[in-house]
């Protein structure tokens, strides 16, 4: 059943303050002893809002570092495809991830001009690359909270099988 306001213009109370969201992403520092502010990386990655100190620069830097270490442990040393969606926190989190990956010398593959990339496109790029190359395997990251509200950010790891 569709929402009663589906297809209608958003009301003022539906809108978020993207500048406040991004400011909180960089300015608020999570408390590692507070369970509500810890990374919870489930089957679809980590999701949360910077306003709740649940999706911030420190979270994404640490999660990306963990992915770098996981890749090394799994022998995944091919390119890493990274994409992002249009949510307000996706751009800042994408940049944080790129910085960590670059610092570790990861071969990063991203959309030209920092454009948006849907999750299936990243998955397909991984699958096609691994199918067509006998050498090092590729994997990926998608910065998206998927269907979560606009105030949320999301960060997903796609292993070499693409999903």
Question: What is the meaning of each model-derived region?
Answer:
Residues 150-163:
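Metal-dependent DNA phosphodiester-chemistry modules and their immediately adjacent helices/loops
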Residues 12-15, 20, 24-27, 107-116, ...:
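Phosphate-binding chemistry for phosphorylated carbohydrates and sugar-nucleotides
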Residues 2-99, 134:
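An N-terminal, well-structured beta->alpha segment
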Residues 73-76, 81-151:
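N-terminal small/polar loop signature for handling phosphorylated ligands or for N-terminal nucleophile
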């Amino acid at each position: 059943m569709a929402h009663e306001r589906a297809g209608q213009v958003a009301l003022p109370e539906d809108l978020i303050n993207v500048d406040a969201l991004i400011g909180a992403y960089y300015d608020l520092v999570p408390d590692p002893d507070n369970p509500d502010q810890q990374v919870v990386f489930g089957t679809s990655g980590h999701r949360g809002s910077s306003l709740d100190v649940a999706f911030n620069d420190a979270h994404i830097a640490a999660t990306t570092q963990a992915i770098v270490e996981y890749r090394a442990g799994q022998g995944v040393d091919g390119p890493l495809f990274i994409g992002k969606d249009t949510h307000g926190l996706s751009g800042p989190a994408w940049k944080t991830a790129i910085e960590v990956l670059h610092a570790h010398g990861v071969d990063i593959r991203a959309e030209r001009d920092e454009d948006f990339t849907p999750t299936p496109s990243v998955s397909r790029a991984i699958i096609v690359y691994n199918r067509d190359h006998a050498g090092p395997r590729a994997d990926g990251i998608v910065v998206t909270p998927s269907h979560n509200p606009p105030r949320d950010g999301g960060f997903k790891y796609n292993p070499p099988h693409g999903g």
